[in-house]
Regions:
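Cysteine-centric segments in proteins
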Residues: 1-54, 61-127
Length: 127
């Protein structure tokens, strides 16, 4: 697997994703980049909408989280290298705290109907 730092702002579709918070307080996406067919780790997240599962990172990249949260071995490999390069010692998976519907394939914004077939009345917000 190749390892590289992206030099430009990208549009990233991330599958099998999670959100990690470092001991520095920064949050990063970890997962599988559908367009590049590679494991991917984001620079620190600057803005994030958990309802639409879209975000902007410090590099200017736009992320769209696709499907359910999960684990990707390529993403984990990149995370191990990136976290060492960035001096991250301790981290926590904060996915369930930031994305209440992380187990659902569709974000709340796209999920018009709940499992019972009635309109979904759920709403969410973050700080």
């Amino acid at each position: 697997m190749r390892f590289y730092f992206s030099s430009s702002a990208d549009m990233v579709l991330l599958e099998r994703w999670s959100i990690r918070q470092s001991d520095k307080g920064e949050r990063h996406f970890v997962g599988y980049d559908v367009l590049a067919c590679d494991g991917r780790v984001s620079t620190p997240i600057r803005s994030f909408d958990p309802v639409t599962r879209t975000a902007t990172t410090a590099s200017g990249s736009t992320y769209q989280l696709v499907g359910r949260a999960g684990r990707d071995s390529d993403g984990e490999y990149v995370w191990r290298i990136a976290s060492k390069a960035w001096g991250i010692g301790v981290w926590t998976d904060v996915t369930p705290d930031l994305v209440p519907d992380w187990r659902k394939a569709l974000p709340l914004a796209d999920d018009d109907y709940s499992d019972s077939g009635s309109p979904n009345e759920a709403s969410g917000s973050t700080d």
